[in-house]
Amino acid sequence: AAKPLDKSSSSLHHGYSKVHVP
């Protein structure tokens, strides 16, 4: 569920945050 954009969100959560948080 990890997207290429999750590189930024991974700093906030884990890496799957894009699925939950935009």
Curated annotation (Swiss-Prot):
Q: What are the boundaries of the region Disordered?
A: 1-22
The entry's keywords: Cell membrane, Membrane
Q: Which domain of life is it from?
A: Bacteria
Where is the secretion signal located?
none
- Gene Ontology CC entries for this record: plasma membrane
Which cysteines form disulfides? Answer: none
List where in the cell it is found: Cell membrane
- Main location class: membrane
Q: What is this protein's function per UniProt?
A: Binds various plasma and ECM-proteins.
Q: From the Swiss-Prot or TrEMBL record, give the protein name.
A: 65 kDa membrane protein
